[in-house]
Design a protein with these regions (language model features):
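Donor-sugar nucleotide-binding helix/loop cap in glycosyltransferases
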Residues: 1-259
Length: 259
């Protein structure tokens, strides 16, 4: 699901299922079959349905480094002990997943972010797959069905029917909540702030063209300002970068961190 160079993004292991498996194993180490019967609803799904869903979800947990299996017995990795909520899980998963630039989920996200404006004109996921293929990334249709569940959860946008609206607000907000590089009230030059963002979120790097920020990053910065998390400054004597075009001024020279 998340491995470098392995095209195995599938729709079954949605975030809530992977989280449920992790939380059960955190409290109850055990054999694979016993864990499956404990976390799956046998009276709702057929045995084969449960097996596919569970196996993919368990594999995703292992690939994220949260669960380990030895001789068919599964237990919690140390990283799982600090995950006590879906927010904890989201922050950990985003950090792990986007460390892997050769994984299919990273490549789809990066390319979608780079060509975000084009992606918004499509009304079917098949069109998105075809378009990304035209930009050099070939992958099976089934992969986009898995991707569409994970990327909004990781904080990179909002799912609206058959389109993912690119907005990295949640992902950036998660980073700001735990960062120690900037002090409250500090006015940070936009160049420094973007370099920090791109180091933490390498999936957005290709969306920027010199000093022109891409749609997903621009949406995130505007949302952060609207939520009172940052203030976008326009100092006349400073180097100006540009947010993705919108009504009013799109120039920005500094980002002030909220107190």
């Amino acid at each position: 699901m998340f491995k470098n160079g392995v095209d195995t993004v599938v729709p079954e292991p949605i975030p809530s299922r992977v989280y449920a498996v992790c939380q059960y194993i955190k409290k109850h180490r055990g054999q694979k079959q016993d864990i499956m019967h404990a976390v799956c609803m046998d009276d709702v799904f057929t045995a084969s349905d449960n097996s596919d869903i569970f196996n993919h979800s368990l594999n995703a947990a292992v690939e994220l480094g949260l669960v380990k299996g030895v001789d068919n017995e599964y237990s919690a990795e140390e990283a799982l002990l600090g995950i006590n909520s879906m927010v904890d899980f989201r922050r950990y998963a985003a950090n792990e997943i986007f460390k892997r630039p050769e994984s299919l989920i990273f490549k789809i996200t990066s390319l979608y972010c780079e060509y975000a404006e084009e992606m918004l004109q499509y009304t079917k996921w098949e069109q998105v797959v075809e378009s990304l293929g035209n930009h050099g990334l070939q992958f099976p249709y089934n992969a986009i069905l898995g991707w569409r569940f994970w990327v909004p959860f990781l904080g990179c946008g909002y799912l609206n029917d058959t389109v993912m609206l690119p907005n990295w607000y949640v992902r950036f907000d998660d980073l700001l909540a735990s960062q120690k590089e900037f002090k409250p009230g500090q006015m940070v030059p936009i160049k420094d702030f973007v370099e920090w963002i791109e180091a933490k979120c390498p999936e957005v790097r290709k969306s920027r063209k010199e000093t022109q920020l891409g749609l997903g990053v621009s949406n995130a910065l505007r949302t952060l300002e609207a939520m009172g998390k940052v203030k976008l400054e326009r100092q006349p004597d400073s180097l100006q970068w540009q947010l993705y075009r919108f009504e009013g001024s799109n120039d920005i020279s500094h980002v002030t961190i909220a107190r």
